[in-house]
A protein has these predicted regions:
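Sec-dependent signal peptide recognition
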Residues: 2-9
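Extended soluble regions of mature proteins
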Residues: 24-232
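Bacterial signal peptide processing site
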Residues: 19-21
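Exposed boundary/loop context
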Residues: 10-11, 135
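C-terminal motif of bacterial Sec signal peptides marking the signal peptidase cleavage site
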Residues: 14-17
């Protein structure tokens, strides 16, 4: 009887440990899109868009939004904390952004209302209920992906979810992430009427952008100065 009770106690713990996730403390996320025009005639007529460079340290996020025409230049910088974003700033102004000051004096808005750079969503993918699971695949760097497709009269899309227990502070669609126990990292979509093929990539990396590193370092240095002054 004791063995049965012990087994009943251990099993839930085992199931919980299997579902345990790991929160990434530091890193960067690139959101990149490729658009192919007149896709049925080939994939030579295309353009790449660098949508966003998301850099994070714990719950503090610095999003660099590149210029559409010249992605090596930064158009605007967002400070994001948890589920709130603050007024975007020009890059030169953002170099001296003070996180604590933004949190106290800023006018934050829900990240789900953000419309430039990376877009946060908390709703299902359009026509998600029509999805059909298809064969798993392996792409670049030997990464495995679970896949599902959505086929409608106007569009055909394939979604790629990489199985992982590591949580990062941005998701192309958290509902799909949860359902397929991973991270949605790629979406291929073909607009049948416009003959337009597009793909969007989420690329997670450990190394942060120097521009963001400098902003985080500025805030760390400032916090140390305040702490030393307070201790005197």
């Amino acid at each position: 009887m004791r063995k049965i009770i012990l087994l009943l106690f251990v099993m839930p713990l085992f199931l919980i440990s299997c579902d345990k996730t790991i929160k990434s403390e530091k890193g960067a996320i690139d959101i990149i899109s490729n658009v192919y025009f007149n896709a049925s005639k080939g994939l030579t007529d295309h353009k790449q868009f660098y949508i966003s460079k998301i850099n994070y340290v714990n719950d503090d996020i610095i999003e660099l939004v590149p210029n559409i025409q010249a992605p090596e230049f930064i158009d605007s910088v967002y400070y994001i904390k948890d589920t709130l974003f603050y007024q975007p700033k020009a890059f030169e102004e953002a170099k001296s952004i003070i996180f604590k000051e933004e949190q106290v004096t800023g006018s934050p808005k829900s990240i789900y209302k953000k419309r430039f750079g990376a877009v946060w969503v908390n709703i299902p993918i359009f026509d998600y209920e029509k999805r059909k699971d298809i064969a798993d695949t392996v792409l670049y760097n030997n990464k495995s992906y679970k896949r599902f497709e959505i086929n409608t009269p106007d569009n055909y899309s394939v979604y790629y979810v990489h199985p992982t227990d590591t949580i990062i502070p941005y998701s192309l669609n958290p509902i799909a992430d949860k359902a397929y126990k991973g991270r949605l990292e790629r979406i291929d979509s073909y607009d049948k009427k416009k003959d337009l093929f597009s793909t969007i990539w989420l690329i997670h990396r450990q190394q942060m952008d120097k521009e963001a590193v400098d902003i985080f370092q500025f805030n760390r240095d400032l916090a140390e100065k305040v702490s030393k002054t307070a201790s005197k």
